[in-house]
């Protein structure tokens, strides 16, 4: 029956596309030797938790405050913000947080010799928080000394986003496990991947009866694998990673030039096509009063007065970078052109400039947002 080529039968074999994609993927990741495919970044995190515990025979996991690694139960235990965790406990008992960029806290957390893995984003997605110089390199050294796996979540930063294939390539970091998703298929097909050292996989799948201790039914489906191969071809053929590095640098510099001109804009930071604009309380009286109105409604609401007109007026999609944050995250396409760059700069200049005029249409929008928020929360009639 299987050989009858009937359209209602699924062929029961291993897809050669998975092998081809694994080979192509690892060619961009020196030091990585094995690949496990799954359906999302969250699934990749869950797989990495199991691999790390099996390979080290240790229970504890360490992660950074304000981290985001997904919303399933295991991944949620590594989530650095209570807003996502509250109401879903108890979560994994052996997950411990340390402050971002705090090597002393990490060293103390590793001191007991019972930590399976340290999970870290090379650039934190929530807030686009950059690592201090040497932080990741020293974190690797501390993990090696403690016998702890260094697990890098590159779901947001990987696949060329920062101007390198991996953000950790900027510091030549040799991770034990690397997590990818989203951009691996161009954002169109559910996909995830865990790459890592051979010995970690061998320790986990170490016997015939343990060959199936972890898997995913659709993890290496042909559609996702074909999408991944297509993405790698486009990245290579169109030199999109090089474009992200070059264009991202000029875009960042031009946005940073706005900081001295606008008192609401405190900092612009980023790497490649991963950029954050951070805002803060103004100094002038009229702006302070308007800001206070928004703060009364909910912390961080100001960013919506920038995000909404960027979309409705300029057709630019951005996002508030996290709960109760004054940070807007911009993730332009890696194929960004000079014309696109100019368009983005003009749009931000227009919207941020209008935010500094009181009254204006944007502050009218802010008043509406604040009123709606207060009504929904029961704080306004």
Where are the regions a protein language model picked out?
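Conserved N-terminal phosphate-binding loop of PLP-dependent enzymes in the Aspartate aminotransferase
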Residues: 1-381
């Amino acid at each position: 029956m299987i050989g009858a080529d009937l359209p209602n039968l699924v062929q029961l074999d291993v897809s050669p596309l998975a092998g081809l994609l694994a080979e192509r993927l690892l060619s961009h990741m020196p030091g990585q030797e094995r690949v496990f495919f799954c359906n999302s970044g969250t699934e990749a995190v869950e797989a990495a938790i199991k691999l790390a515990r099996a390979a080290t025979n240790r229970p504890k996991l360490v992660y950074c405050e304000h981290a985001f690694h997904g919303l399933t139960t295991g991944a949620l235990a590594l989530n650095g913000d209570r807003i996502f965790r509250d109401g879903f406990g108890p979560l994994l008992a052996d997950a411990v947080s340390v402050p971002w960029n705090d090597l002393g806290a990490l060293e103390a957390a590793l001191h007991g010799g019972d930590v399976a893995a340290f999970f870290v984003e090379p650039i934190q997605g929530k807030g686009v928080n950059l690592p201090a110089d040497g932080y990741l390199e020293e974190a690797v050294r501390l993990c090696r000394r403690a016998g702890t796996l260094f697990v890098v979540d590159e779901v947001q930063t990987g696949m060329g986003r920062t101007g390198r294939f991996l953000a950790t390539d900027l510091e030549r970091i040799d991770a034990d496990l690397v997590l990818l998703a989203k951009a691996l298929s161009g954002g169109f097909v559910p996909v995830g991947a865990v790459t890592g050292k051979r010995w970690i996989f061998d320790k986990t799948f170490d016997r015939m009866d343990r060959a199936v201790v972890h898997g995913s039914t659709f993890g290496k489906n042909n559609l996702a694998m074909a999408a991944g191969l297509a993405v790698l071809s486009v990245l290579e053929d169109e030199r999109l990673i090089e474009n992200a590095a070059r264009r991202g640098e000029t875009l960042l510099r031009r946005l940073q030039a706005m900081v001295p001109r606008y008192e609401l804009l405190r900092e612009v930071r980023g790497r490649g096509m991963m950029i954050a604009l951070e805002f803060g309380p103004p100094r002038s009286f009229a702006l302070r009063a308007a800001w206070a109105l928004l703060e009364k409604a909910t912390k961080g609401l100001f960013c919506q007065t920038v995000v909404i007109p960027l979309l409705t007026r300029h057709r630019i999609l951005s996002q508030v970078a996290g709960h109760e944050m004054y940070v807007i995250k911009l993730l332009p396409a890696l194929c960004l052109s000079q014309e696109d760059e100019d368009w983005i700069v003009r749009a931000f200049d227009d919207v941020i400039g209008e935010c500094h005029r009181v009254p204006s249409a944007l502050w009218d929008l802010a008043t509406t947002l604040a009123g709606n928020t207060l009504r929904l929360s029961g704080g306004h009639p």
